Regions:
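Glycine-aliphatic tripeptides that mark coil-to-beta-strand junctions in extracellular
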Residues: 83-87, 137-143, 190-196, 249-253, ...
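Blade-edge motifs of beta-propeller repeat domains
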Residues: 37-70, 87, 101-123, 157-176, ...
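Recurrent small/Gly-Pro-centered beta-turn motifs in extracellular repeat architectures
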Residues: 89-91, 143-146, 196-200, 255-257, ...
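Blade-level signature of beta-propeller repeat domains, shared across WD40, Kelch, NHL, RCC1
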Residues: 398-428
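C-terminal motif of bacterial Sec signal peptides marking the signal peptidase cleavage site
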Residues: 33-34
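Beta-strand-rich domains and repeat architectures in extracellular enzymes and scaffolds
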Residues: 64-95
Length: 428
């Protein structure tokens, strides 16, 4: 799932286990989101709520050391040696990256610089992601620097005290047009690799792959294996969702395209991808914005929920249809599944997670009219719980998830141009 959200593990994560065992095992991902640039909560067990019907999000913005702060991007991370979710924030001008350390009930410490390198940096930080790249237990920073004509990757490693520093090998050149990066294990060796993409990559070769894949050698050093691992792709990539879609135990890629056909790339087991779009996806032309995955019908196959600005009327099942599911019929073969409960107006983000601890995926959808919360009951059944479950403020551009109070349930931080909010998941 594209944002790291709480949802029962899919068989892509634990091979050879039944759904029942999955439900009692690990309980964390990652949509949404995550899809691109996603915050990964570090949940180590599956929490099952005693009273799921009592769940709601409560505003806890007063735990933050600021009332108003213009935010370009944020991610939860493990910045120090405790297990609480800390917060990394990039300011609106994209010039300063700050770390807010979580002090539990005392709230977050006042913003501190991410390190000497970030203080001395003169280039704009176009985008950043967080992940443990060298397997030392602390999340590192992956930055995209500079203008789109000449982007660069800079990796800053964490000393596990919230201080981030570069290594000599931590800076790499990127293809012009690169905009985002998602840390994900593509070759199945347990290390986070880096998947880069953009809306329009200006490659120097005739094969426009529109992505870059940097494989982690195991110690936080990377090798560019794009030409070996990725097929040629058309321009227009907006986002990507990683999950085991064909049931072989390794992560595949669902690419979200603007104004065109979305793409499905299947992993051969060692990180080489082939385009299976024509044989495995229904033809649907739409203006897609985001996608996330979950096993909605609990048949062991990962399904997809796609949100869009619009769908070409030829592919709508009912008037006003804007968002839809792709139901996995097995082996990574999908069919469109409509559901009239989904919002019928332009939507920009979707996050799938088990918000109320009943072992069914719920959905948060960011739309032109605000945030919607859909409670899942399984077998494609949902109810609109927006008014009951969410605080009044419901206008976000993006959301990230983390465990603020270490209760094993996901809390969230959301922001827009107008404001930001911290919501804590409660059961009372």
């Amino acid at each position: 799932m594209k944002v790291c959200k709480l949802i029962y593990q899919k068989k892509s994560c634990l091979l050879g286990l039944s759904i029942t065992k999955l439900i009692s095992g690990l309980f964390f991902i990652l949509f949404v989101s995550a899809c691109g640039g996603i915050s990964k909560p570090n949940i180590t067990r599956n929490p099952v709520a005693h009273n799921p019907s009592s769940q709601s999000f409560r505003d806890a913005t007063d735990l933050l050391p600021f009332e108003k702060f213009a935010i370009a991007q944020a991610n939860f991370l493990l910045a120090n040696q405790d297990s609480s979710s800390d917060l990394a924030i990039l300011n609106k001008s994209k010039s300063k990256l700050s770390i807010l350390l979580n002090q539990g009930r005392k709230g977050f410490l006042k913003k501190i610089p991410a390190g000497q390198w970030t203080q001395n940096n003169k280039e704009k930080i176009k985008f950043f992601a967080t992940a443990d790249l060298n397997n030392d237990g602390g999340d590192d920073l992956i930055l995209i620097l500079g203008a789109s004509e000449n982007p660069k990757m800079q990796i800053l490693f964490n000393n596990k005290k919230g201080y981030f520093y570069p290594k000599e090998v931590g800076k790499y050149s990127l293809i012009p047009g690169i905009e985002k990066v998602i840390p994900v294990d593509l070759d199945g060796d347990g290390d986070r690799d880096l998947f880069y993409f953009g809306n329009m990559l200006k490659a120097s070769t005739k094969k426009y792959r529109q992505t870059m894949v940097w494989i982690n050698k195991g110690d936080g050093n990377f090798e560019n294996l794009t030409s070996l691992l990725m097929p040629a792709l058309p321009a227009g990539i907006r986002d990507a969702s990683f999950a085991d879609y064909d049931g072989d135990g390794v992560k595949d890629i669902f690419l979200v395209y603007e104004k065109g056909q979305n793409k499905l790339l299947i992993n051969n087991g060692v990180g080489k991808f082939s385009d299976r779009t024509s044989s495995s996806l229904p033809r649907i032309l739409d203006d897609s914005m985001h996608a996330d995955w979950a096993d909605f019908d609990r048949d062991g196959d990962n399904d997809i929920l796609i949100v869009n600005r619009s769908i070409h009327k030829k592919y709508r099942r009912y008037s006003g249809e804007t968002n839809y599911f792709l139901e996995n019929k097995g082996g990574g073969n999908f069919r469109k599944r409509s559901n009239k409960i989904l919002p019928r107006f332009p939507s920009q983000k979707v996050y799938l997670f088990d918000g109320n601890g009943n072992n069914h995926p719920d959905a948060l959808i960011l739309t032109a009219k605000g945030v919607y919360y859909f409670k899942g009951y399984g077998k494609w059944q949902f109810s609109d719980e927006t008014i009951r479950r969410l605080p009044r403020f419901k206008k976000f551009d993006e959301i990230i998830f983390g465990d603020i109070n270490q209760d094993k349930f996901l809390d969230l931080f959301g922001w827009s141009r107008q404001a930001s909010r911290l919501w804590v998941n409660r059961f009372d």
